Amino acid sequence: MASSFSRWLVDPKKNPLAAIHMKTLSSRLRNYGLRHDDLYDPMYDLDVKEALNRLPREIVDARNQRLLRAMDLSMKHQYLPEDLQAMQTPFRNYLQEMLALVKRESAEREALGALPLYQRTLP
């Protein structure tokens, strides 16, 4: 019951509030030329950092360029020009598959009782 409700809650095809949220998020990401996967912070989650390290260099460079452009536009209190906003694809994922693979590998290592490949320590 709870899982079907939660699936309904986040599905924009079934829930009109989720559709409104997705449309709003899409327009805000288009304003700065970002993709949804650009919002993941590699300093917060080490799995994201590992997934970014495994991606091809061109994809990571494009991500960094989008983030730099978004920061520059934000500091100038501007948005992308309308013609560039129309070309943006905010929900084209490039990180999800690799992130799922990294999370599966870390869950498998944990299930086998092995030490994690990477861990954060306090200085």
From Swiss-Prot:
Q: What happens to this protein after translation, modification-wise?
A: The N-terminus is blocked.
Q: Which Gene3D superfamilies match?
A: Cytochrome b-c1 complex subunit 7
**Which GO terms of the cellular component aspect does the record hold?**
mitochondrial inner membrane; respiratory chain complex III
Q: Which InterPro entries match?
A: QCR7, QCR7_sf
SUPFAM superfamilies for the chain: 14 kDa protein of cytochrome bc1 complex (Ubiquinol-cytochrome c reductase)
> What are the alphabetically sorted keywords of the record?
Electron transport, Membrane, Mitochondrion, Mitochondrion inner membrane, Respiratory chain, Transport
User: Where in the cell?
Assistant: Mitochondrion inner membrane
What GO biological process, any one, is recorded here? mitochondrial electron transport, ubiquinol to cytochrome c
Q: How does it sit in the membrane?
A: Peripheral membrane protein
Top-rank taxon of the source lineage equals Eukaryota
Give the UniProt family note.
Belongs to the UQCRB/QCR7 family.
Subunit organization: Component of the ubiquinol-cytochrome c oxidoreductase (cytochrome b-c1 complex, complex III, CIII), a multisubunit enzyme composed of 3 respiratory subunits cytochrome b, cytochrome c1 and Rieske protein, 2 core protein subunits, and additional low-molecular weight protein subunits. The complex exists as an obligatory dimer and forms supercomplexes (SCs) in the inner mitochondrial membrane with cytochrome c oxidase (complex IV, CIV).
Q: What does it do?
A: Component of the ubiquinol-cytochrome c oxidoreductase, a multisubunit transmembrane complex that is part of the mitochondrial electron transport chain which drives oxidative phosphorylation.
Q: What is this protein called?
A: Cytochrome b-c1 complex subunit 7
Q: Which organism is it from?
A: Solanum tuberosum
Taxon lineage? Eukaryota, Viridiplantae, Streptophyta, Embryophyta, Tracheophyta
